[in-house]
Amino acid sequence: MPEKKRCQMERKENKARFCALSEVLADWKWLLTYSRRCKKMIALYIALGVLGTTVGLFGSVAGKYLIDIVTGYDTARLPLLVFAAIGSTAVSIAFDCVVSRVLKKLEIDLNNNVRADVFDRILDADWQALHAFSCGDILNRFETDTGAVGGGAVSWLPQILVTAYRLCAVFFLIWIYSPVMALIALGGAPVVLLLSAAVLKKRRAFENKLRRLGSEMTAFEAETFYTIDTVKSLGTMQSQSRKLKEKQEALRACSLQYNMFSVRVNALLRVAGAFTQFTAMGYGLYLLWTRAITFGTLTLFLQQRSSLTSAFESAAGLIPKFLSTAISAHRVRELCELPKERHGKTALPQGALMVELKNVTAAYRNGEAVLKNVSFAAGPGEIAVLVGTSGAGKTTLVRVLLGLVYPESGRAVLRGKNGCEIVISAETRCAFSYVPQGSTLFSGTIAENLRMAKENATEEEMTAALKTACAWAFVSSLPNGVNTKIAEHGGGLSEGQAQRIAIARAVLRGAPILLLDEATSALDEKTEAQVLKNLLTALPDTACILTTHRPGALKYCTRLYKAENGALTCIEVNKPA
């Protein structure tokens, strides 16, 4: 290979290694912001760890002198040394108990803090940015990676400081008795440091791949369970099972590759440790043979050499944990650093509102415009109906109204009675009572589902809302009425019943704009007609927007819009009855 090309490749590798290290450090800088929230407890944890190490060393020195007494070298201080040995053991046990308690409290508090923060960030994330992640991937990061972040924030700094103190204390204790033995015991350190630095990039690549494969498998499992009815009805159980096994095999292969890599690295570290151990033992036996040290001192040397090696192994073990936690922190950071929703700063006017879109063009990220220069309006007491084929832009228009998708051009506003305009954003979402396609009920009682719209709703208010949605007849016939429990997605109810409860929940919310996205699709024509009549009667000052494929709703509309190829045409405008 030409010298110039080889130098270019080396520079490229060094640059990649530097970038990887910079990213890891940035992830840890973000993670340690959580450590600052519990800095007093972490300081206590560190202090207890240092004191526990000191007590352990004190006990080792006491043991050295006890051995010398037994072997006849020193008999004058037997009572004191027995007391010191017993006392150090008792104190060590007490420290272990306190440290365990402090650590558990720290872990719980920080894990809860991290999970709560990530949960809130996800809820406030921009809708389009969030949809770059599958639900399974988000769940995997939320369940697995947040725990690693919390654990790292709790234990990383204390482990570094306590391990560093332990290394220094043991080294200087050995140095007091024999500087040569101390240097021999320290001999494995360069191997540990050099080897750990050399494998940094490869460890990070393995960790990244394992997390990605784990997220893919969780996403596949979540999607399968969510669509279990479809899987069963299509008879694709064996196909799904086969796909899961393929993903498991990919994860297994990667895990075994990483394991083999770790085995080789650990074997090299063990060889270096064994060489140091035999060298130290040989030198110690030589000193004992020449009567330069006592048998108790040799025991102390071997014990502390083992302790020093253990401390180095702990330090070496921190490096894979450092990388693994950094990967988790990076994955959580990706969720926390998603762009936030746009929040308006103007308070909504009281009373009825009119919604208006003027020459709006909207598109999804990295895609063509779905809405092209459309205009739309719906005022108090009106029912504006959107019709059109699938993919024509109806759902996108609904998302614009809800502040989930932002216009690239044009204006989307709410107008109050006094003529003031407010730009639609996440902040204006409270002006809408929204009933989306499909079942949107949660597990719990019917009353709990209704009170999601209004927490302090009375029995009378819930009954009135259910009557408006033509749901009171079947709800009142249930054994426990509104206190009847239902499963997730409305399990235990028919699709039409679930839709009517969702409409009742929207009515109970009392927002000035009611937005129904195919929300009557599961109702028969007679029930659909009655629901629309009830809405006009019960909500005279509410603007109602309805997307539908069915002709039955058209006779109740005051504005009819047809969506086609991204355009929106107002077909007819009738005055409210």
Functional labels for PLM-detected ranges:
Residues 402:
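Helix-to-loop junction immediately C-terminal to a conserved catalytic motif
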Residues 1-55, 71-84, 99-103, 107, ...:
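Membrane-integrated ABC transporters
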Residues 396, 438, 449, 468-469, ...:
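ABC-family ATPase nucleotide-binding domain "signature/switch" substructure
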Residues 32, 37-40, 127-128, 144-153, ...:
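An intracellular "coupling" helix at the cytosolic face of ABC transporter transmembrane type-1 domains
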Residues 233-236, 260, 307-335:
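Cytosolic ends of transmembrane helices, especially the final helix of ABC transmembrane type-1 domains
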Residues 37, 41-54, 84-88, 92, ...:
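Transmembrane helices of ABC transporter permease
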Residues 84-96, 189-193, 197, 262-278, ...:
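Hydrophobic alpha-helical segments in the permease module
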Residues 116, 334, 411-413, 447-488, ...:
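ABC ATPase nucleotide-binding domain helical subdomain, centered on the C-loop/LSGGQ "ABC signature"
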